[in-house]
């Protein structure tokens, strides 16, 4: 593609655009530059790409996009916001793939991963080829690709959408993080349905205030365009029980569909019954009333199913098909996942890493726990410190036997993180500290008896632990199974 054609994607810029320069590749990482590359200088949180402009030229870059002055021998085009420019250029370069896809974006503090997997499976069971982008992986049809972030950078994202189209995918479902929205990673993506799950404290190391965090989430709905006169209008699916849904509604001109339990909603659950094996509830919808029996446990699971069914309705999938699919799904890896190894007590691994997420899971366990509740929990290093004492307080308030431990300490001292946590706990409260996460899990398993419940919270599906600069193998599910087998004399 000629540079002058590609630059049609950006309405305002300065610098001369050659009609002869051919662009065969776009990169923001100088290590990925090859001959024919348009190199985009991104001033990031850790690295400033402007410092690598000269290196990009050495490797074969033929033009540069920049915000700040760079002194190189090839054409430089200056823009106000290079992150947003990159998203627009990526969309144009890869042929605006989301205009041909049905695209669903799901945002919120908790529930994004589960809902995205539920919606993807519903659409697939309806006979369509699907794509999925989220916390655990990217998926194109049946092909699984690794992912580093919940929402990839805009170049990777648009390339993935293009590859989905080439593979016959008709509907793509993705988790949309607040970081991605603020950083413009999804700018230029043409969403058909946007889903808001909930908002509770998380990422305040980045957003600083809940107001900023909420505004970040609302960007997805502001991006959901006005399309009153099309056959497929844009739709916002909102949680009627979360007060921040009002903000999301004000941000968009799209049609609104609501779901909820407490407030009146288009998709409303009632008569909810929770057991250790699943949940049942009555569902009111615009097309009739139904009774559901799902294998997932807890009110938060009911919310996730409501969101998935409401989204399926927005995608014109028959209600009976959506219900049949969600009733057949056992759950998502690392989300209230039961570990069975012959023990007489439930061991649950869950990704709950926010105060609200931990509270939801512990409240659900309280519905069926017969005796003691053990919770193994820590907090991530180099992340929102404000939630640490809240997590500890919830643990001691809702579990009989809280055990504080390491999560992903990253560059922080694990003990210092735990000290931050116990600031939220009165001195009289009983808790145990095992800094080593493996030891904490084994302690809980060795203490537990029939009728007790163990929750291992915070890491869920993750099969690694980040300690300093090292990424080591560590899977809560594997560690729990090993501990159980040792207790039972099976290992």
From Swiss-Prot:
Cell cycle as UniProt keyword = yes
Q: Which GO terms describe its molecular function?
A: ATP binding; magnesium ion binding; tetrahydrofolylpolyglutamate synthase activity; UDP-N-acetylmuramoylalanyl-D-glutamate-2,6-diaminopimelate ligase activity
Determine the domain of life of the protein's source: Bacteria
Extract the Pfam families matched here.
Answer: Mur_ligase, Mur_ligase_C, Mur_ligase_M
Which pathway or pathways does this protein act in? Cell wall biogenesis; peptidoglycan biosynthesis
Q: Which InterPro entries match?
A: Folylpolyglutamate_synth_CS, Mur-like_cat_sf, Mur_ligase_C, Mur_ligase_C_dom_sf, Mur_ligase_cen, Mur_ligase_N, MurE/MurF_N, UDP-N-AcMur-Glu-dNH2Pim_ligase
Q: List the disulfide bonds.
A: none
Q: What is this protein called?
A: UDP-N-acetylmuramoyl-L-alanyl-D-glutamate--2,6-diaminopimelate ligase
Q: What is the lineage of its organism?
A: Bacteria, Bacillati, Bacillota, Bacilli, Bacillales
